[in-house]
């Protein structure tokens, strides 16, 4: 995961560069590999790409501290977790070749290779092997409808200096977060995590009482656009937004599932075969990375299926790393089911044993990361699994949440 942040003072007040730095520092944990900034005077000047203390030293761009806040009314901040194209070519914010379009992007476009080939056929040239550059070319080719071409998980924001507008989008299922504050005619700010907005002094922490009531009733906070904090919204899944210099914000849904669509006359065997083909293709696309990829294994049908499919897709000499949470309580532990999976596949097994004592010791840190309330200690178990993967040098984990509803 990467971390993105941006602010646009729609009334052309100067931005607070120190606040931009604080906002980006607040999400350093999302991207330890690189740091970058974009400063823009939307009235007349060319955008300026800037560096911070953690910027890749192979890049020769000026430090953000050289500039004064009163010169700019828009800024982007970025923290990178490098997954595709580990070179400095993947640095963000990234510009189009003509310098007119800039992007900050968190996530991965799984079909970037196919899109790259298609866009090359339209005359686009590429200098890197990153999916970020593909998004920029797609935007220049198809405009805002570019998101309809993406197969992936993403949250992105684009500054179009020629049109003087900002375009933002979130993936079809809301895998990547996009929080924002919008004060008409005055301010628009966005971030991967709300702590960036707090660090920059752009949002408060007053609780939204209706959302809190819904949480106590349903046990969920991601029900609509409203977060549990009064003045912070989330861009819904499969939505994009456009913000123009006159302060107008428009949102639209770019994708949906039509429940009226039906496939009639298929045999059970054909349904199963079609599902198998789509599922295998989906897993295979998610293995595209320039860093180590592992799997989260819970013992359930969902993650067990993912591990088994990966085993068939990898070369015969390759061994995948799995990461699992185990429990002393036999009624909660799924170790025997994990054993069945690991014994029949080429797997290097890694286990972590979360305890109630560790849970309470780390609860404050877990709250800091989660930002909104949750109802199950399984959040802590999953957090422990992710930490174990990091300790073992694995950057990307495939997992099964949601898949059990299909299987």
Region spans (language model):
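Active-site adenylate/phosphate-handling loop in enzymes that bind or generate adenylated species
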Residues: 172, 185, 384-407
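Cysteine-centered catalytic environments shared across enzyme families
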Residues: 1-371, 382
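Acceptor-substrate binding/catalytic loop of class I
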Residues: 373-376
């Amino acid at each position: 995961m990467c971390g993105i942040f941006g602010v646009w003072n729609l009334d052309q007040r100067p931005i607070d560069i120190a606040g931009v730095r604080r906002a980006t520092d607040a999400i350093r944990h999302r991207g330890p590999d690189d740091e970058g900034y974009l400063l823009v005077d939307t009235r007349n000047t060319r955008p300026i790409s800037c560096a911070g203390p953690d910027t890749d030293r192979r890049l020769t761009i000026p430090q953000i501290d050289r500039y004064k806040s009163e010169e700019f009314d828009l800024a982007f901040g970025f923290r990178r977790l490098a997954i595709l194209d580990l070179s400095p070519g993947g640095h963000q914010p990234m510009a189009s070749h003509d310098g007119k379009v800039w992007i900050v992007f968190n996530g991965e476009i799984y079909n970037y290779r196919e899109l790259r080939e298609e866009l090359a056929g339209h005359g686009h040239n590429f200098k890197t092997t990153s999916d970020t550059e593909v998004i920029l070319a797609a935007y220049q080719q198809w405009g805002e409808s570019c998101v309809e071409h993406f197969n992936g998980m993403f949250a992105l924001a684009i500054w179009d200096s020629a049109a003087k507008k900002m375009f933002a989008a979130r993936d079809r299922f809301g895998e990547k977060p996009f929080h924002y504050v919008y004060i008409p005619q005055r301010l628009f700010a966005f971030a991967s995590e709300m702590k960036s907005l707090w660090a920059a002094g752009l949002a408060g922490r007053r609780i939204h009482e209706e959302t809190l009531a819904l949480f106590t009733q349903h046990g969920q906070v991601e029900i609509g656009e409203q977060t549990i904090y009064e003045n912070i919204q989330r861009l819904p899944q499969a939505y994009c937004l456009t913000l123009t210099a006159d302060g107008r914000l428009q949102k639209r849904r770019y994708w949906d599932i039509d429940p009226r669509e039906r496939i009639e006359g298929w045999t059970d065997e054909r349904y199963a075969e079609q599902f198998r083909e789509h599922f295998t293709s989906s897993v295979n696309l998610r293995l595209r990375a320039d860093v180590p990829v592992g799997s989260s294994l819970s013992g359930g049908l969902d993650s067990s299926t993912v591990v088994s499919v990966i085993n068939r897709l990898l070369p015969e000499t390759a061994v995948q790393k799995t990461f699992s949470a185990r429990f002393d309580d036999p009624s909660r532990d799924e170790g025997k089911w994990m054993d069945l999976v690991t014994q029949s596949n080429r797997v290097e097994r890694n286990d972590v044993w979360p305890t109630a004592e560790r849970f309470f010791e780390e609860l404050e840190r877990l709250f800091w990361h989660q930002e909104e309330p949750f109802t199950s200690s399984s959040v802590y178990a999953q957090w422990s699994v992710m930490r174990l993967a990091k300790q073992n040098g694995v950057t990307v984990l495939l997992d099964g949440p949601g898949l059990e509803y299909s299987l």
